[in-house]
């Protein structure tokens, strides 16, 4: 709709950088698209992949992040990338696990081990990492209600 952001300040959750130029921001997928694809999204049809790529039902699925930090993350998993902001690391792991659980994405054993080790090393509260069945139901309902939002003319 040709709208542009005229100004503002944004706090990057990954690095705690305070940004004043919208062009420094990028939208990051908590679970990178490539990671999602190899973790199970390759089985999905176009509409589900499109919905995953644009999902707004869970506020931590898409993150407004400092572009340089997002580029450093790339398509890495927690075994090779963690955000530098120490106070955000446990939340980052929780959000990543939530997205994986919601979308039925798998983990390689090395990724699962790295996450388990990080939870211990960072002294994350294991109970805070739990995801309730009610949360999953709520998000699953949102997914089902919005599965037709992407281009309906595209044929698998």
Language-model regions, residue ranges each:
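Long, compositionally biased stretches
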Residues: 1-11
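Domain-level detector of nuclease and nuclease-like folds
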Residues: 10-154
């Amino acid at each position: 709709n040709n709208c542009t952001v005229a100004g503002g300040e944004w706090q990057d959750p990954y690095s705690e950088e305070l940004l004043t130029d919208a062009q420094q921001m990028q939208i990051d997928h908590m679970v990178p698209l490539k990671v999602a694809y190899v973790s199970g999204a390759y089985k999905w049809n176009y509409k589900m992949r499109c919905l995953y790529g644009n999902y707004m039902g869970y506020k931590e699925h898409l993150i407004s992040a400092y572009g340089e930090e997002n580029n450093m993350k790339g398509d890495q998993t927690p075994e090779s990338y963690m955000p530098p902001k120490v106070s955000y690391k446990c939340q980052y792991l929780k959000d990543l696990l939530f997205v994986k659980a919601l979308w039925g994405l798998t983990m390689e054993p090395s990724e699962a081990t790295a996450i388990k080790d990080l939870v211990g090393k960072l002294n994350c509260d294991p109970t805070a990492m739990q995801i309730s069945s009610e949360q999953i139901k709520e998000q699953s309902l949102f997914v089902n209600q919005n599965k037709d939002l992407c281009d309906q003319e595209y044929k698998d």
